[in-house]
Amino acid sequence: MEDKKKRMAIIASKGTLDMAYPPLILASTAAAMDVEVGIFFTLYGVDIVNKKKIRSLKVAPIANPAMPSPIPFPNILGVLPGMTSMATMMMKGMIKKINWPTIPELVDICKEAGVRMIACTPTMEMTGVEKEDLIEGVEVAGAAEFLDFALDANINLFI
């Protein structure tokens, strides 16, 4: 009897720099372990695969109290002008220091590993994103298409 290949389904709903890493790292790692992987990018998660936004994802320090900082500051200071830029710059510095790939590099790694990437049609309609705005290789489909994949998954994650 032939073993069925393991499958992992991920929903990526956040489009910030810090929240783009978990689905892409998990997907690329699972694919390297010979797991069939699909990521459904919905709501702000579509920004991760949007050519116009992929290189400018940001980190919002407000409501992110666990964010490491060389200088501790109260969470309320996150509302001040320039704090998002500062937090983004700090995170990019930490990422570079530990030699992690950038988000565009991770997306390429996922594509090369055969990770199926699906952008949510209703989200695209709601936000005015066109198929041409997406990076090459991203499918466009609704929830039913993703659920068809996810219903047979061994692991389902919502990030």
Give the residues covered by each predicted segment.
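Histidine-anchored nucleotide/phosphate-binding helix
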Residues: 21-33, 39
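N-terminal beta-loop-helix "entrance" segment that forms/cooperates
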Residues: 45-58
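Anion (oxyanion) recognition and catalysis
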Residues: 31-32, 111, 150-151
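Short, glycine-rich nucleotide/cofactor-binding loops
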Residues: 10-20, 49, 94-98
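A glycine-rich helix N-cap at a beta->alpha junction
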Residues: 57-92, 99
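Alpha-helix-centered segments that form part of catalytic cores
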Residues: 83-117
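Short internal beta-strands
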Residues: 37-43, 118-121
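Glycine-rich, aromatic-bearing surface loops/beta-hairpins
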Residues: 95-96, 119, 124, 132-159
